[in-house]
């Protein structure tokens, strides 16, 4: 059973870990620590945006293929859909990715999408800009401290637009008021909802 958490990586990574641990699910995480482009990207988004997005798209497609061949329940903290519907268009709209690169990227994604099935459940964790900034400061990653507010705002707006048109099974969690880590009642409420929707 494939499950996907979507939303800002600052809001969903810990949630993915907790859900996987609680139910013995297999967790697939966004490849951040060994990403050869990430630090360069945050220092010069225009120069490295296409390289980074292709890197993520490649990793994500490999994950999709692997997950589709597994009989286990797998939860993933970033989806191939977000790359093409959120991040690449946001970079293009902000002038951080050229039209040539964006069209090339989109063509590649459309080909991959023709081979991809929707997950059994998509879980969108909605976080406000102030909440995202809190997460960034708590994580303390140097390269994230230079993130522009307009960049975060653009991502949030695109998430909302995409979620409105998403055709698969969807669950929305308020990331501002739901505390997975420190409030067991919040965690139980969300997990009960997930289990009722996926019928494990």
Q: What residues fall within each predicted segment?
A:
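A basic- and aromatic-enriched beta-loop-alpha substructure that forms the phosphate/nucleotide-
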Residues: 60-98
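NTP-dependent small-molecule kinase module
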Residues: 133-198
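Conserved substrate/cofactor phosphate-moiety recognition/catalytic segment
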Residues: 21-59
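Single conserved hydrophobic/aromatic residue that forms the stacking wall/gate
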Residues: 1-7, 12, 199
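Hydrophobic positions on the alpha1 helix immediately C-terminal to the Walker A/P-loop
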Residues: 15
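Hydrophobic/aromatic beta-strand patches that form the interior of the parallel beta-sheet core
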Residues: 28, 76, 121-123, 171-173
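Conserved nucleotide-binding/hydrolysis micro-motifs of P-loop NTPases
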Residues: 32-35, 80-82, 127-132, 177-180
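A glycine- and Lys/Arg-enriched "phosphate-lid" helix/loop adjacent to the NTP-binding pocket
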Residues: 85-158
């Amino acid at each position: 059973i494939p499950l996907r958490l979507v939303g800002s990586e600052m809001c969903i990574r810990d949630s993915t870990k907790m859900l996987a641990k609680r139910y013995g699910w297999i967790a697939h995480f966004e490849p951040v620590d060994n990403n050869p482009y990430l630090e360069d990207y945050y220092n010069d988004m225009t120069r490295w945006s296409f390289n980074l997005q292709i890197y993520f798209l490649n990793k994500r497609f490999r994950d999709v293929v692997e997950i589709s061949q597994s009989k286990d329940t797998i939860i993933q903290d970033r989806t191939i859909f977000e790359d093409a519907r959120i991040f690449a268009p946001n970079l293009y709209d902000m002038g951080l990715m050229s039209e040539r690169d964006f069209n090339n990227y989109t063509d590649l994604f459309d080909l991959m999408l023709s081979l991809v099935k929707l997950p059994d459940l998509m879980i969108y964790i909605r976080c406000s800009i102030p909440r995202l900034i809190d997460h960034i400061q708590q994580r303390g990653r140097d390269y994230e401290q230079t993130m522009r507010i307009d960049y975060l705002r653009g991502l949030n707006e695109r998430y909302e637009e995409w979620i409105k048109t998403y055709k698969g099974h969807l669950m929305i969690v308020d990331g501002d008021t739901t505390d997975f880590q420190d409030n067991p009642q919040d965690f139980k409420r969300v997990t009960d909802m997930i289990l009722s929707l996926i019928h494990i």
